[in-house]
Amino acid sequence: VGELVAFSCRRGDLIHTGGPGPTAQEGIRAHQKLQKRRPKGAEAEYRLQVQLECAGQDILLEGRVDILHPQADLHQPAQLDEIKTTYCHPGKLPETTRLYHWAQLKIYGFCYLLQQRQTGSSVEEVSLQMVWYNLKEKKSYPEQSLFNWEALESFAGDALSLYIHWHRSWQAHRQQVIQTAKSLSFPFPDYRPGQRQLAVSAYRCLRDAGQLVVEAPTGIGKTISTLFPAIKALGEEKLDQLLYLTAKNSGRQVVRETIAKLHGVGLKLSLLELSARDKTCACKLGLCSRDDEGTCPRTQGFYDRLPQARKQLLGQPWITPEALAKVADQWHLCPFELSLQMLPWADVVVCDFNYVFDPLVHISTLQDPRYKRALLVDEAHNLSERAREMYSASLSRRDSRRAALACKSNHPQLYRRIQSLVRALAQWSKRFQEQHLYKEIRSSQNVQAWCSPLDSEEDRPATVSRAIQKVLDTLSELSEQGKFPPEEIGEWLKSLYRYACIEQILSGQHQALTRVIDRDAPWQEHQLKLMCMNAAGFLQESCAQFHGAIFFSATLRPTQFVTEQLGIEPETPYLMLPSPFEPSHQGVFLCPFVDTRYQARKSALPALVDLIARVYFSRPGNYLVFFPSYRFLQMVVEHFQKDYPEIQPLQQTPGASDREREAFLGSFSEGAQSLGFAIMGGVFAEGVDFVGEKLIGTIIVGTGLPQVNEEQELLRQSAEHPQTLSAVNGFDIAYRYPGMTRVLQTAGRVIRTESDRGVIILADYRFADMFYQNLYPKHWQIQTSKSGEQLSQQLSCFWKQQRLSVCNVE
């Protein structure tokens, strides 16, 4: 019933309330409360199930109505109650929402009367009661109407006809997908070494609804080796839909290219790309303007124009942001919302991690257990850190004060509520400053920071929570009046909603991080962060909703660290594949004569600049030098330019636009001799293909350790706590493993194909430590360079060997 109503019965405007609605937990509690009050003889969660024929189609229609009051006598028909929770008076609900609620109840009424008729009853009428429960007032608002069979049959018939005609079109497309996927052949003449093993393992995993972890070196073809078997599983109807999760645009591009190859060998399949709302919003892109009440004209009458747009996109091979924008313009619809409406009808969906794992923005329809959806998680080495961020939330006193001031003129009540939150944040911090109850994790002239548990209600910042709830209540009241807060506080509101969301799901993996900045200033900055130490449990819970999941990356090591961070069971298959390329094509040189630790950086500058120059002049071409921070990068660039003014290095800049990034990458072309300076873990260090002569070497400066700050220290301390059942060292969890992941990802830019040749320079004495040696890929043939002079000799020898091997091949 829910699926039918959602598809066929929405009319009018797309409604945004301006804030989060009632949570699932609030809705469940309200339902249970009202169901307990039901009179004797009434049934809660009454199951309705009917079989019927409509438009030549056999239909099984089922659902559960909240309360059934059986027919008491001939003069009093049976009554069905449907409960909906709200934060406002039902009279202030948008008409679109009220009609949608009533549509669901009418379909339930139709099912009930048909169920009675199919059992021989002559009942012709049913009483339907919509019960809106106002969570703020803790009060019910019932609305009741009597419906006869003829009216309900007509209403349900119209809804079913719409759905059946759509479903037939979708089934025709689906049969094409199944037939072409079944006969699909691998789009290359041969498998690379390791590719077939990966494809077979991936197929078995998805067929059996299992999980698989894959570390496969760069260049092996992870995308085709996971997508191809997954699509074969679609063809055999083992799966209904594939979700390909990737965090970077470069990852999306590889998926597009892979699907294009499969289309080229006969596959008929639709791919939908979900982009962030901010990147597709027509108002933000200047394509339309909101009215005086903040309403986007593309949301007005959205559901009335949606069917035509949906029909136009069904079965299209490429439902990309560009294709969505074009159709959205034609039908004057919101492009982002149109993409969400197409989500159930695409065969492959490419999107960011957050649409599956983020508790605030995840798309609930993706986790419908009735459908067999599988996850393909690319760049899985980034997932644990991203997930910790998704399950964390923070508030700033300074940002809250700015938000309050922005509301002062036009929304005085909201201003007062936010000011109360500003005071509550200061009071929470003063508790730490004055009572010395909790351990300081940092204290300097400018900053104080404490961590505290969140295990019990007594430990939690209740005053802050109450202040937030009052702000949310006021926002709901404004929304009911058709008023909205100023756009300039939009980002602050997102942080407020996230805090309210995370507060509802706090676990033993959360701690409070409290900071006081400018501690001696007249107006101090206070920050409160609900910080997730390990999101493994949340990831595990999310993955359980899907029919199989494959996590893959070029760097997923060591296994124990990865499984603990991703919530993967120890018995899960873990596939570690060798490099498909000739090891001698890659020279790896360890340079222990350079010390890049923070306190030694100034003294290391001459040796480091000399090292970079030696590598570059050993064979001029395209090189990238990677640093752990922009500050260090800038120091080296300035020193390098003084010593080698004839070379004009390129450098990555913070906050670069997409166009600036493309220009940077465009400088690394075949035949060029570009020397670039970039950041480890940044956009140029992961997911970028530098094929052939586009990159012949990387110089990795330092071990990539994350910057020491309160968050990383809290992460380290939490992992070392006696109650934490981890066999992995806290310093390794917080610093060394994430750093080494960056190093290995960065090194993977060099060799991308069988014909590539290049060098990797590990510039730091710590790389000689046994900890790091144990993490190096097996195919690395490492040479130690004890001085700059020796490095030059080794590089000369390496490039000479490469020239000879190329000549021999030719």
List the predicted regions and their residue ranges.
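Metal-dependent nuclease catalytic cores that hydrolyze phosphodiester bonds in DNA/RNA
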Residues: 1-71
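Walker A/P-loop
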Residues: 207-229
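Mg2+/Mn2+-dependent nuclease catalytic core
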Residues: 50-153
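A substrate-engagement module of RecA-like helicase motors
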Residues: 178-181, 185, 238-349, 357, ...
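Conserved RecA-like P-loop NTPase helicase motor core
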Residues: 592-603, 654-767
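A contiguous, basic/glycine-rich beta-loop/short-helix subdomain that forms a polymer-engagement track
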Residues: 324-349, 360-366, 471-595, 603-604, ...
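Signature of the SF2 helicase/ATPase Hel1-core->accessory helical subdomain module
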Residues: 226, 331-348, 353-472, 554-568, ...
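Conserved pre-motif I regulatory segment
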Residues: 172-215
